[in-house]
Amino acid sequence: MDGRKGSTVNLEDRIALHNRMARAYGDAYLRQGVQDGEKFVDVWKFHPDCMYASPYFTGDEAFKLSEFPEESARASTMEAKVYSLRFPDWKPVDFKHWPADNGFVMKTRWQGTNKDTGTVMGFYSYSFIDTDDNGEVVRWETHINSEYSDFLDVAIGVHGPFHGTHEYTDALDRRLAEEGLTV
């Protein structure tokens, strides 16, 4: 099943794979296992030229995933661990996904209770994942709603929009260092 060798996955199997990929993502976060290193991306196979884009996280540019300083699983663990410092119960409270022949879309309502104030805060994220005929991710795009900036101000002390491949993960690293933690 290697896109560089010309094999393809039939349509029914590709849609089933997209369903599994979305569920792996939602389930890993729902169990709050990502903050402890659980990898939803084990089900995801990335094309070597996979692109990531997000107006909030990377500005107006798309970047190869290989250009990011952290691989996706580690970056996801960093993010979940940092968020859980202030919001120990942070996780999806609503997760929907729609598989298709060329990828899938996910809509997630993330929410948590601020351990210091008892205030519940949350935001929506929307991810669009495009795959090739082999089920390898070729583009991953993330959008979030306006509540996210307020959430980040509390969770990591800074909010975006961020630019480039490292501003956001650098902010996560700083927050972990403040707590004497590493990933």
Residue ranges with predicted function:
Residues 2-183:
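C-terminal and inter-domain tail/linker signature
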